[in-house]
Amino acid sequence: MIGYLFGNRVLVDDKELPLIEAYYLLDKGELEVYEDDKKLSKEEFLKKCLTYDERFLIRYKAYKELRDKGYTLGTALKFGADFRVYDIGVIPKKGKRSEREHSKWVLYPVSKDETFDFYEFASKNRVAHSTRKKLLLGIVSDKIEFIEVSWKKP
């Protein structure tokens, strides 16, 4: 596939890919990205991605880990999260959906060195709960660990 960098998106045929999905496909050798008439190397494209998102690599590592395992991820900006994650085998669609077709988690990738206070943690958990999803923290270091958090009423 061939894509063309256009701001913070990559245009492929009649689709717009977010930078993170374009980088994933480039990383797998399934996409070539051009800016104007110049083919970008993986390193050049990564630099472009980092100009839009300084946390790109942290987000990408968690994204890649789940995509490689067969999960589908989408943006979760409207939920105040980085990504929404669909169970393996679920294809997101618009319109009326069964319970199984909704995303199961909202994902917040964080570096193992990052800290956040209880209020920030509670805020992330409330967002997940209010959207009927579970909170998934992706702890990124040399390896990626995922922690699933559920909201319980006493």
Curated annotation (Swiss-Prot):
Pfam families: tRNA_int_endo, tRNA_int_endo_N
The keyword Lyase is annotated on this UniProt entry: yes
EC number: 4.6.1.16
Keyword Glycoprotein part of the UniProt annotation: no
Reactions it catalyzes: pretRNA = a 3'-half-tRNA molecule with a 5'-OH end + a 5'-half-tRNA molecule with a 2',3'-cyclic phosphate end + an intron with a 2',3'-cyclic phosphate and a 5'-hydroxyl terminus
Biological processes per GO annotation: tRNA splicing, via endonucleolytic cleavage and ligation
Domain of life: Archaea
GO CC list: cytoplasm
GO function terms (MF aspect): lyase activity; nucleic acid binding; tRNA-intron endonuclease activity
InterPro entries: tRNA_endonuc-like_dom_sf, tRNA_intron_Endo_cat-like_sf, tRNA_intron_Endonuc_cat-like, tRNA_intron_Endonuc_N, tRNA_intron_Endonuc_N_sf, tRNA_splic, tRNA_splic_arch_short
Residues annotated as the enzyme's active site: Y86, H102, K133
Keywords: Lyase, tRNA processing
TM annotation in the entry: none
Family to which the UniProt record says this protein belongs: Belongs to the tRNA-intron endonuclease family. Archaeal short subfamily.
Entries under PANTHER family matching the protein: TRNA-SPLICING ENDONUCLEASE SUBUNIT SEN2
Function noted in UniProt: Endonuclease that removes tRNA introns. Cleaves pre-tRNA at the 5'- and 3'-splice sites to release the intron. The products are an intron and two tRNA half-molecules bearing 2',3' cyclic phosphate and 5'-OH termini. Recognizes a pseudosymmetric substrate in which 2 bulged loops of 3 bases are separated by a stem of 4 bp.
Subunit structure: Homotetramer; although the tetramer contains four active sites, only two participate in the cleavage. Therefore, it should be considered as a dimer of dimers.
Protein's recorded name: tRNA-splicing endonuclease
Species this protein is from: Nanoarchaeum equitans (strain Kin4-M)
Gene name of the encoded protein: endA
